[in-house]
From Swiss-Prot:
An annotated Gene Ontology molecular function: DNA binding
InterPro entries: Homing_endonucl (IPR027434), Intein_endonuc_central (IPR004042), Sporu_reg_WhiA_N_dom (IPR018478), Sporulation_regulator_WhiA (IPR003802), Sporulation_regulator_WhiA_C (IPR023054), WhiA_LAGLIDADG_dom (IPR039518)
Protein task: Involved in cell division and chromosome segregation.
Keyword Thylakoid annotated: no
Protein name: Probable cell division protein WhiA
Superkingdom classification of source: Bacteria
Entry keywords, A to Z: Cell cycle, Cell division, DNA-binding
SUPFAM superfamilies: Homing endonucleases
Family the entry assigns: Belongs to the WhiA family.
Keyword check for Cell cycle: yes
DNA-binding region, residues: 274-305
Record's signal peptide: none
GO annotation terms (biological process): cell division; regulation of sporulation
Lineage per the UniProt record: Bacteria, Bacillati, Bacillota, Bacilli, Lactobacillales
Length: 314
């Protein structure tokens, strides 16, 4: 099961207060779409998620006690087990749709203010909208993304305004024949999940994200350390070659000034050490070791280029 499916499974198991059930139900039916069937004007809400179908059925039965509701299942492909679920509202259709502020013909996609006049109602509406038409990438993926899709621009703008109220700075983008309201920042996706009541999914998102960020930090440190080690090894090999050139030219390191002689011998004895570590061997600072090594490099360069040199001035 995908992470998004886990989130929706958690949300469909939440117990919703009766005062907020209508807001969630309004979003579920509005975002899934309602269609009229047959001469008896039965209303059908279709979804491919069995848990969401059960959620719509349960909320309808609990909110409107006397309505007649059924769930139908359509098997589209026996091999892939692809099924869709229809929630059929058979009685009190006009009453229910009017109470939920839903226009069955889609001519008025905006949500009536009375459905959203309390903070918890707006939370519930966002939850229903996500259940019906939302998705979220797994926190394991590099690109964090949460979105809600709607075919109506007016509804997309309402969703964006609702999300902004909870400090969720979403954006709207056109996609196909509709619009998506989306979040890209991981911390805001976490806040959205908490806002709509997906607490366990939110904690899982945070745990996975923290582990992923930690692995990335460790990898960056390892890469940086590896690069530094390679850089140190290249520099040390060059220094050893320069010291050997000096020995070949002078016949011995003994005629060098003591400070240069000591650093040269230390480098030959410890070819893999950093300059700071060579400084510790000689009981001098890193800058002191670096200064002496530069003097040896200067001498080796003069030898290579055939330039006259004075050892007493090094």
């Amino acid at each position: 099961m995908s992470y998004a499916a886990d989130v929706k499974k958690e949300l469909t198991g939440l117990i919703v207060h009766a005062g907020n059930a209508k807001a969630e139900l309004a979003a579920l039916m509005r975002m899934n779409g309602v269609s009229t069937l047959g001469f008896d004007q039965t209303i059908r809400v279709q979804t491919e998620n069995a848990a969401i179908a059960r959620r719509i059925y349960t909320l309808l039965k609990e909110t409107y006690v006397e309505v007649e509701v059924e769930v139908s299942v359509t098997d589209h492909n026996h091999l892939s087990q692809h099924k869709s679920y229809g929630v059929l509202l058979k009685t009190k259709i006009d009453e229910v749709l009017d109470d939920l502020g839903i226009d069955p013909f889609g001519l008025h996609p905006e949500v009536p203010p009375r459905m959203l006049n309390q903070v918890d109602k707006r939370r519930s509406f966002l939850r229903g909208a996500f259940l019906a038409a939302g998705s979220v990438n797994s926190p394991e993926r590099a690109n964090y993304h949460l979105e809600i899709y709607t075919t109506h621009e007016e509804l997309a703008e309402q969703l964006m305004i609702m999300m902004q109220e909870f400090d969720l700075p979403s954006k709207i983008s056109e996609r196909g024949n509709g619009f998506i309201v989306y979040l890209k920042r991981a911390e805001k996706i976490v806040d959205f999940l908490q806002t709509i009541g997906a607490t366990q999914s939110m904690l899982k998102f945070e745990d996975i994200r923290m582990m992923r960020d930690m692995r990335n930090s460790v990898n960056r440190l390892v890469n940086a350390e590896t690069a530094n080690m390679q850089k140190t090894a290249i520099a040390a090999n060059k220094q050893v070659s320069q010291i050997n050139l000096i020995i070949d030219t002078l016949g011995s390191l003994d005629i060098l000034p003591k400070k240069l002689r000591d650093i040269a011998k230390a480098r030959l004895e410890y070819p893999d050490e950093t300059l700071a570590e060579l400084g510790e061997v000689l009981d001098i600072s890193k800058s002191g070791a670096n200064h002496r090594m530069r003097k040896l490099t200067q001498l080796a360069t003069m030898i290579e280029q055939g330039i006259d040199y004075d050892l007493t001035k090094l």
